[in-house]
């Protein structure tokens, strides 16, 4: 007796998951934001930050309606990385030395790509599973949502502030930051607050890249030792 074939899941249904639709909205918001990033900085800031906030919304919606999907997770991470990369490229055209922002871009992409690939090699279901990490800061980042949120928000807000306070092309980054911090204003307080969270995030990115590289090397060693 022939076995009945299981019905194939509809691809379209996954594309139309509510959290994935939120993801498409994020992409659209970012497209509009970057289209006006030089002509209307305040509008860019509002659209970009709103898109960033939707990052938390799509995750909550996915869990609330049981619509967690691999496609959604990939869409979420790609949107995050691309939007941050675009903003860093813009800042590299405004401030000098531009290498600062290009280095941050390289670190962000390299650390997250290595982390995702090492997660695949280790057979883990999520790149946020770092319970076996020897770094307490790395475990704290992925284990404490409040701390993670603070670090991520600090990075994005800092980059937005730098875009808003730039008056001319080819600004000196250090001079602008020091001048803003010495003004003793709500903006200087916010800048200082975000600088600390930003520094934590970059430290974690370095740890993440090194930890992921270790996993890849360990995988190669174990592969060579197999008969």
Swiss-Prot record:
InterPro entries: CDP-OH_P_trans, CDP-OH_PTrfase_TM_dom, CDP_ALCOHOL_P_TRANSF_CS, CDP_diag_ino_3_P_euk
Catalysed reactions, semicolon-separated: a CDP-1,2-diacyl-sn-glycerol + myo-inositol = a 1,2-diacyl-sn-glycero-3-phospho-(1D-myo-inositol) + CMP + H(+)
A Pfam cross-reference name: CDP-OH_P_transf
Gene Ontology process terms (BP): phospholipid biosynthetic process
GO molecular function annotation: CDP-diacylglycerol-inositol 3-phosphatidyltransferase activity; metal ion binding
The entry's keywords: Lipid biosynthesis, Lipid metabolism, Magnesium, Manganese, Membrane, Metal-binding, Phospholipid biosynthesis, Phospholipid metabolism, Transferase, Transmembrane, Transmembrane helix
Major localization class: membrane
Cofactor(s) in the UniProt record: Mg(2+); Mn(2+)
Residues reported in the UniProt entry to bind Mg(2+) 2: 55, 76, 80
GO cellular component: endoplasmic reticulum; Golgi apparatus; membrane
Binding positions (Mg(2+) 1): 55, 58, 76
Transmembrane region(s): 12-36, 42-61, 73-95, 101-122, 142-165, 177-200
Expression sites by tissue: Expressed in stems, flowers, shoots and roots. Present in epidermal tissues.
Location in the cell: Membrane
The UniProt record lists the keyword DNA-binding: no
EC number(s) stated in the UniProt entry for this protein: 2.7.8.11
Active site annotation, chain numbering: 80
The organism's place on the tree of life at top rank: Eukaryota
Keyword presence, Phosphoprotein: no
Binding locations of a CDP-1,2-diacyl-sn-glycerol: 59, 63, 69
Similarity annotation: Belongs to the CDP-alcohol phosphatidyltransferase class-I family.
Summary of the function given for this chain in its UniProt record: Catalyzes the biosynthesis of phosphatidylinositol (PtdIns) as well as PtdIns:inositol exchange reaction. May thus act to reduce an excessive cellular PtdIns content. The exchange activity is due to the reverse reaction of PtdIns synthase and is dependent on CMP, which is tightly bound to the enzyme.
PANTHER family associated with the record: CDP-DIACYLGLYCEROL--INOSITOL 3-PHOSPHATIDYLTRANSFERASE 1, PHOSPHATIDYLINOSITOL SYNTHASE
Protein name: CDP-diacylglycerol--inositol 3-phosphatidyltransferase 1
Organism: Arabidopsis thaliana
Organismal lineage: Eukaryota, Viridiplantae, Streptophyta, Embryophyta, Tracheophyta
